[in-house]
Amino acid sequence: MSIAERLIELKLIKHNLKTIINGLGGRCGENFTLYHTDLEKLITERDTGNEYFTNFNISDNITKIGDYAFPNAKFSSINVPSSVKSIGERAFFNNRSLTSVTISEGVKQIGSDAFNSCSNLEQINLPQSLEYIGWGAFNNCRKLPRITLPTNIKEIGSYTFANNRTFTNFEFPSMVTRIGDSAFSNCRKLGNITLPDNLTYIGREAFAYNQVMTEVTIPDTVTTLGNGVFAYCMNLEKVTFPEHAIINLTDGTFKFCTKLREVNLPNGITTISYIMFQNCANLTSITIPDTVISMSSNAFMNCTKLNDIQLSQNLTSIGNSVFYGCTALSSITLPNSVQTLGDSTFRECTNLQNITIPEGVTKLENNLFFNCKSLTEVTLPLTLVTMGLNIFLGDTLLTNITIPKNVTTIGNSCFQECGSLTSITLPESLKQLGSSCFNGCVKLQSCNIPSQVTRIEPATFYRCKSLTSITIPDSVNYIGNSAFDGCTKLQNANIPNSVTRLEDRIFNNCVSLTNITIPNTVTFIGQYTFGGCNNITELIIPEGVETISQGVVHACQKLEKIVIPHSVKEILGQGIFYGHPKLTDVIYNGTKEEWKKIKKATNWWTQSGLAVIKCTDGDFPLRNYLTTEA
């Protein structure tokens, strides 16, 4: 049944009907007037034909415009009479032809999203009788240049004026106590505002993404600023708080306010919240009030001009990445109250020169001073027990450091690429030294390994080109891959009897190493273990070794003699004796028949120039030593 047919039927309805509700629509043509001398209420179901309405009048008998009454219609103007007391949710949603609205005195309520996405609305007057505006009521009304709220309004709901592109100013009624989430979010041209004196709450991202606002003053009545209230306000330069305000500043309050240069934090706050000032690239200085006891993760991350910060004297905790990327920060004084420093706290602070970690701190978290390229001096507390991963990685100007006497663990890559580090003394308390700990410390000349350490992890001293000697204690039972690889000045090194395997490349390219003794506890020798050790003249492999891997003595230019034990069961890889121009003696402590039974890779001796293997019962000839053995 069409709307026109329904209207005929509705003439018979009793005279006490007064409401338009739920999607009045249909295909009634371009002109439609809702009035009748006997009709006071029209009830319809939601329809899809509202896009056909272009002109619409509401008679003085109507008291309510219901939810979803005219979504997607094409009205150019609307006059709401004084008889109407409320306008329902989404009543005129997405009416893109609507340019003006007149709402008469008497209307008390505008529902949520009532005019949402009326993208060409340019003029609307709100009556003083209005007491409530629902969330999103004028969201996406992009061309609305101004609006005056009646004095009775106490709350501006979430998204009420969001995404307006023409607002330049806004006056708040004095009775407003709450501004909801994203209420003015993405109002890009909204200038400086005066917040009302009775305001207590500003919701999440209420003014986020504003491109014009340069300063704002927070009233002393405000107790909560929601997450990201002023986030991405790219031109905001100054924020003023009441000195003694009791206020909850939540996550991301000023994140990406790239021109923010001045903010006074109130004495009532206790926490600097997560990403509060992240990417505030023009913030140069800030004082953290003494009421603050903690700073959450990423609070000042990438504040690239921050060079002066005064911390709370009651601060106990600094979270992860708080000062990550603060490239202008050259010094900072940590109060004695600090007990914890989070992961990456000072990472990429490339101008930080010196710092003292207060007593009471027991652990340095991962990446704490990662790539602090100007750091020359660090004082560590006696209370320190654990040092995490990558703490000083890339700190190229750090020349020396004292590790406190109670430290038991130093994590992976802790001092990697500390290119100026010349010496370090490790405490006897140390039990664990992480992999790549001193990798790339090209000026490190000496380092002790304490007696409680049981493992030298892979690449621990990789490319320590100035290291001349190392004493490995008997407690060590494992030496990992490339542990001393590239230590070109290493002349002396010992392998304790507790070691059973020599992993790949342990002493690879140790060109100054003249001799090495392998203990008889070793059963396995990995690939290129002594590769490129140009000053070794002989290598005696002890009884007990069962596996010799590829390239064990690869390119040892001065090598003349190798002794292979009777215990060997397999020789892995091709060209095991390749690159030894002076090698003349390969002695096997077994018979020719036993030698022949050893498992070998195809062409294991190719390009070596070797003619025979000297066995206990005579020489084993290599008939064609370029291709196959006898």
Regions found by a protein language model. Give the residues of each.
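Generic detector of short, aliphatic-rich beta-strand segments that form the cores of beta-sheets
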Residues: 36-46, 610-617, 624-626
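Intrinsic-disorder/low-complexity loop/linker signature
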Residues: 40, 252, 553, 617-619
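Short, aromatic/basic amphipathic alpha-helical patches
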Residues: 575, 597-607
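Consensus positions within tandem repeat domains that build extended binding/scaffold surfaces
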Residues: 66-69, 88-91, 111-116, 134-139, ...
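Surface-exposed receptor/substrate recognition regions of extracellular proteins
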Residues: 1-55, 64, 585
